[in-house]
């Protein structure tokens, strides 16, 4: 099992074990959801893994409707079981590639959050337990580490309503690159956020009107 904010998750082989930095990024998403004007905010967690981020939101904000999307069949076993256990009424898990996220809620979503694979292909993770135990599919994001980030940004642009919030976790050396990526795609209010170690750890952006 893994403890994450106020929840306990089932994890095992084939699923990424959530890190403390992601708890902090999740806090940003929770603040964004709480700021929503809608009575039942809709939240997507893309690249959901164990479901940690989405389920923390679903349990801390019971009026939110949370959908987790995960492409790995191995990981999805944990995603679906954790959703059934922790958010049976206000959460659901979907087995799909991010690019194939269902379109039935396009333009209606309030917040999209993602902790995508973002490690450049040549980099060896600094944490031995990551290199040895976490699945490569959850870690590596292509040559510059941003392949999946680009897809997440495009999918979020169709999911979110104008004024909706996107939050993406990234590596500490990717802050500027992710900012420019989102600005080039037309996102507004693009901001880098530093974690508890004062390292660039995530970006937030608003879908323009």
What annotation goes with each model-predicted range?
Residues 1-32:
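Conserved AdoMet
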């Amino acid at each position: 099992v893994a403890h994450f904010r106020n929840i306990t998750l089932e994890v095992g082989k084939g699923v990424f074990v959530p890190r403390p930095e992601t708890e902090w990024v999740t806090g940003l998403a929770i603040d964004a959801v709480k700021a929503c004007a809608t009575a039942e905010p809709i939240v997507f967690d893309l690249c959901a893994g164990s479901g940690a981020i989405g389920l923390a939101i679903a349990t801390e904000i019971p009026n939110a409707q949370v959908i987790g999307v995960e492409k790995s069949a191995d990981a999805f076993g944990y995603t679906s079981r954790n959703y059934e256990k922790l958010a049976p009424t206000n959460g659901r898990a979907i087995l799909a590639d991010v690019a194939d996220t269902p379109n039935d809620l396009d333009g209606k979503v309030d917040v999209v959050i993602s902790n995508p694979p973002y490690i450049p292909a040549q980099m060896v993770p600094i944490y031995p337990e990551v290199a040895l135990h976490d699945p490569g599919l959850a870690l590596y994001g292509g040559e510059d580490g941003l392949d999946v980030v680009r897809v997440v940004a495009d999918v979020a642009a169709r999911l979110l309503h104008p004024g909706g919030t996107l939050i993406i976790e990234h590596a500490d050396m990717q802050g500027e690159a992710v900012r420019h990526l989102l600005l080039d795609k037309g996102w507004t209010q693009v901001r880098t956020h530093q974690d508890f170690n004062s390292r660039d750890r995530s970006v937030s952006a608003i879908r323009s009107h």
